[in-house]
Amino acid sequence: MIPSQEYRKSVVHQPENVPSGFRGATHWLAGKVHRRQSKQQALLEQAHTIHTAAEAHRTLSLVDLQAQLLSFRDHFRRRARGYEQHISAAMALIVEASHRQLGLRPFPVQIMGALALLEGSLIEMQTGEGKTLVAALAAVFLGWSGRSCHVITVNDYLASRDYARLEPLYTFCGVTASCVIGELKRPERQRSYQAAVVYVTSKELVADFLKDRLLLHGVSDPSRHFLHSSNTLREGDEVPVLNGLWAAIVDEADSVLVDDAATPLIISRPVKNEPLMEACREAVRLAAKLQPTLHYTVEERYKQIALTSEGNATIEQMLPTLPPFWHSATRRNELLLLVLNAREFFRKGKDYVVSDGKVVIIDEFTGRLMPDRKWQKGTQQIVELLEGVEPTDPVEVAARISFQRFFRFYKLLCGMSGTVKGVTAELWHIYSLPYVAIPTNKPSRRTTQAPEYFLEKGAKYAALIATLEALHRQGVPILVGTRSVRESEFLADLLRQKMLNFQLLNAIYHKEEAAIIARAGERGNITIATNMAGRGTDILLEQGVAALGGLHVLLAEPNEAERIDRQFYGRCARQGDPGTSYSYIALDDRLLQRFFPERFLNSVMAEVLLRRLPGSHALMQLLVYLAQQMAQRMAYQQRLSLLRRDEQLDQLMSFAGSGPKF
């Protein structure tokens, strides 16, 4: 490969700063234009034309079909004049190739989705509509470019599964494909990343990106990495594994680009820091003597804690027995507030679990265990001490980057999800991703029951179990959704008391995730799941279950993002199947407790529900809506603030001549 080709493949796109002010207003207007209905209708009409053209290719021999595909591949790789005009003709051949190689004939709506991806859009397709195949149709085109296309999946299982299923199509179309999973060693990763289409999780991809940056020995501008490699690498030296960041198709895009956006991926190494460990132990011991309300106040809504005058006085009285370090008010308050925050806001079974004597973080939005993720600045050690496990050594950060910053490096970014509505403005503002809604192939047959509201959780769970028992007697499969491991375990205990058999899927019992979710559509099955609920794995109905009404999903508590509720409801009624969704909400649910005064909920709203006043359900629905809107607005502002700080730091580093830091 000649140097210019090598450089082109390894260069990284440098994004502009997030628009603000007048530029932000014009950018917002541009997003409105991109979302116009006429554009979506034009894509659907083009898709129907392609679907009709593909039917005419049924008579082609396998040899002729492949010959025409390879001819288009060469044409697109050369980017010959007018190549865009041939997208429809080439797509029709790929549709036929999919039917021959996979036994799957894409529907017009799937073709529409692929066309939208090629335009760099974010598409919303409902669960079960075949997003995996949609990504493959687009990936063939992007693979023909001669540069790598990364297909981002939720976990290693899906990366391996999708690659194995779709590899025959890629090979037939003259496109190399591979997958990168956690168990691969670095030489294997380098070979895999050379493929035209690479299936990989965001975690593995970003970690490899950071490790590549560390190999550059201070050359932190990614676009200069080839020049550094050419002039400094010797035979036998470790080399970067990535093949540039050109195109990415992100599955479950709302989870990756929004929920995980501000999460930093960190390359770190443990370091001994005995003074910090001793300070954490002393802080935990002191905090044990402090009581809420008397010594400190708790602001649940903003997750803030403040010491009272009584609290400060109590600490002052302890000073003579403490080491000199504690005589600094700033230092001791910082450590004590860390302990109090961990004690008041970090919940075992919700934020973390203790497994094999270790504190393991749970992802807030997916419910998955994150064994490689650690809290910073002493928080990890404090939680470990509070749980009575051996504290781990603190870590020294070698490199870090947030997911939202990383994905802005791609020249062509596109994605798909079943739950995009609600974050379309943010995705346009941060990533310049226009939104395209893809219609369902068949009309939805989901029945949505009106939400049920209760004064407290005890009554809510009693009603949920009563509904579950009635449905179980009918033989229908049932999926119960919870927000936390603790809640899922609590419901599991209730079902054990009722002598009901069930499957439990949460961060503790996660290894059989795909198998558990796949069986959730069998007659009479009861499945309890946290938010991890098998995104990317279809729930297929057992024969005869559709006649009973299909899968019934029961949501035990509203999430902070309404789209996560919708994602859970979307587990039922796929591809025209019947299904029913239920939701249960209590005044003492965490969402309402966080955003509304306790006195208002326990007096005014309790009285409204107790008396069943007219409009009480509409008022409760409004409260849930407002709470979810406030939660998402706060989360968005935090993500935007983090990105702006990153941009300011880049500008300072560039001014100093050292380029962006990772």
Curated annotation (Swiss-Prot):
SUPFAM superfamilies: P-loop containing nucleoside triphosphate hydrolases, Pre-protein crosslinking domain of SecA
Enzyme class: translocase
Molecular function GO terms recorded: ATP binding; protein-exporting ATPase activity
Primary localization class, coarse: membrane
Compartments (UniProt record): Cell inner membrane; Cytoplasm
Secreted found in the keyword field: no
Binding-site positions, ATP: 110, 128-132, 538
GO cellular component: cell envelope Sec protein transport complex; cytosol; plasma membrane
Keyword terms, alphabetized: ATP-binding, Cell inner membrane, Cell membrane, Cytoplasm, Membrane, Nucleotide-binding, Protein transport, Translocase, Translocation, Transport
Acyltransferase recorded as keyword: no
UniProt cross-references to CDD domains, sorted A to Z: DEXDc_SecA (cd17928), SF2_C_secA (cd18803)
GO BP annotation list: intracellular protein transmembrane transport; protein import; protein targeting; protein transport by the Sec complex
InterPro entries membership: Helicase_ATP-bd (IPR014001), Helicase_C-like (IPR001650), P-loop_NTPase (IPR027417), SecA (IPR000185), SecA_CS (IPR020937), SecA_DEAD (IPR011115), SecA_motor_DEAD (IPR014018), SecA_preprotein_X-link_dom (IPR011130)
Annotated EC: 7.4.2.8
Membrane topology reported for the UniProt record: Peripheral membrane protein
Cross-referenced SMART domains: SecA_DEAD, SecA_PP_bind
Record's catalysed reaction(s): ATP + H2O + cellular proteinSide 1 = ADP + phosphate + cellular proteinSide 2
Chain ranges passing through the membrane: none
Job of this protein: Part of the Sec protein translocase complex. Interacts with the SecYEG preprotein conducting channel. Has a central role in coupling the hydrolysis of ATP to the transfer of proteins into and across the cell membrane, serving as an ATP-driven molecular motor driving the stepwise translocation of polypeptide chains across the membrane.
Family: Belongs to the SecA family.
Self-association and partners: Monomer and homodimer. Part of the essential Sec protein translocation apparatus which comprises SecA, SecYEG and auxiliary proteins SecDF. Other proteins may also be involved.
Protein's name in the database: Protein translocase subunit SecA 2
